[in-house]
Amino acid sequence: HHIVDLCKRFSVPEPSPDSSCLYQDFGGFELRWERHTEFANFTFICPDVEAFSADALTFVPKDWLADMPGELVVAVNLVLTGEEPDEKKLYQWFEGQRVSGAWIADRKAQVWTAFKLHSDGFGRMVACNRGLTPYQAGRLVQRLFELETYRLMSLMSLPVARKMSHELGPIEDSLATLNQSISDIGAEKDERVLLQELSLLAAEVERHRSNTNFRFSASVAYHDLVRDRLNQLREEPIDGMQSLREFLERRLTPGIKTCNSVRDRLEDLSWRILRTTSMLRTRVDLSIQAQNQHL
């Protein structure tokens, strides 16, 4: 509905209700819109705008932007230029932040980014075309946007993982205490109480698993997409500068490992509770059989 509203304002053809993409010239800017499973992206394209002093959003109605539904996850300004910027220009554009960069596509392009937000609230990327066709340049821009989008989407599970890591400690301690109690069992009543406590622990772990499973699985999938886009870029190093891959390996991979570690802890806890419950049920059954035989 939001896209349709924009189209009506500029008197351009609207997408059909079941459309998942739109590419349209709005006069002062072009818009590429795509709807994905978890998010939608809006790419506003404007030619001949001075780098990072203005952007394509200048031409978009402010009230329309303010009313956009959902939560903002990724905001990036990308400049495509034909002239290689010198160190002074890069320092100015990236506001003194440490920049990662590389030669791309068999040295037909160069890209630079700081992978950080800048004073305008946007991330920044610069791509210098050194021999790409218009189609290839468009594909490069698309891959760079996807790289940043999938990078940030993959990290959405990190706060969940950190919170869950703190919550799993007490559950693991409770299970250890229950296992110790099982070794000290004397009466049938104790066994039944322990089974009930195990059942409550199992329910808590399963609740955590169901609440986090989608987020953790999505994180792995997005991380795979990041690596895929990196491979498609075919990076070659720029002297004295860390590559995009080096930055992502150093900053993104540990976060993904944290998420995978917490997910593995959850799976391990679930299996250990199941095994303990099974052993305890066997003891209860044997105890009941012994009582029946005695009777």
State what each model feature region is:
Residues 45-203:
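Extended alpha-helical interaction modules
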Residues 38-40, 121-123, 257, 264:
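Structural beta-strand/beta-sheet cores of well-ordered domains, especially the beta-sheet scaffolds
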Residues 202-295:
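Membrane-associated alpha-helical segments
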Residues 25-30, 107-114, 219:
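Short small/polar-residue motifs
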Residues 12-20, 94-97, 122-131, 222-229:
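Short, mixed-charge, low-aromatic patches
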Residues 3-8, 58, 62-66, 138-145, ...:
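Generic detector of well-ordered alpha-helical segments enriched in charged/polar residues
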Residues 1-82:
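N-terminal pre-transmembrane cytosolic regions of membrane proteins
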